[in-house]
A protein has these predicted regions:
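Hydrophobic alpha-helical context, especially transmembrane and signal-peptide helices
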Residues: 6-8, 41-42
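Conserved catalytic or regulatory cores that recognize and/or transform ribose-phosphate-containing ligands
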Residues: 18-174
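Bacterial N-terminal signal peptides
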Residues: 7-15
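Positively charged n-region of N-terminal signal peptides that target proteins for export
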Residues: 1-4
């Protein structure tokens, strides 16, 4: 009887410890922190959302990406540099923002860059240059972007997947 009881307990413990983790998506922005148990959990894929923000005046494509990943069966942390209350005049804010982005670009397992056609996006071009060789970047660039050919040629040269609109990229995630 004791052997049977130990067998049942061992089986239950193994089944609990081997249960797959539940799907989850977290969005992390500058000046925010993840719960400690999430930040230590290596089962999450970390994705940096690089690209057009235009001081918060552009399409909130980061929210669309979040919605898409929320529908998927996986565990994701989305690093989103877009701040709700961005204030470049606050002392130290620019340095904090740039370093936050650089740190999280390096930490990411994947970089999704979206450049809107109506934007100049000089920082996005800089980030693309820094990470094109990383093997972890996908670029979405609308054809009416004023430097589209530069982006297209660079993506081709380094083997970076290039999409012309967000919807085409999102379709690849299904």
């Amino acid at each position: 009887m004791r052997r049977f009881f130990l067998y049942i307990i061992t089986t239950l413990l193994l089944s609990v410890s081997c249960t797959p983790k539940q799907p989850a998506v977290y969005m992390l922005r500058p000046h925010e922190e993840l719960p400690e148990e999430i930040s230590r959990d290596n089962s999450f894929t970390k994705i940096f959302l690089a690209g057009t923000i235009d001081m918060g005046n552009s399409r909130d494509w980061q929210a669309e990406i979040h919605d898409k990943f929320s529908e998927m069966n996986g565990r994701y942390i989305l690093y989103n540099p877009r701040q709700e209350n961005w204030d470049a005049t606050r002392p130290g804010e620019m340095e904090y923002q740039v370093k936050w982005e650089l740190d999280h670009l390096e930490d990411a397992d994947m970089i999704i860059m979206y450049i809107l056609g109506t934007s100049k996006s000089p920082i996005s071009l800089l980030e693309m240059g820094l990470h094109a060789k990383s093997g972890k970047m996908s670029v979405i660039c609308e054809k009416d972007f004023y430097r589209y050919d530069n982006v297209r040629i660079t993506c081709d040269y380094y083997g970076v997947p290039l999409y012309n609109d967000l919807e085409s990229f999102l379709d690849t995630l299904e």
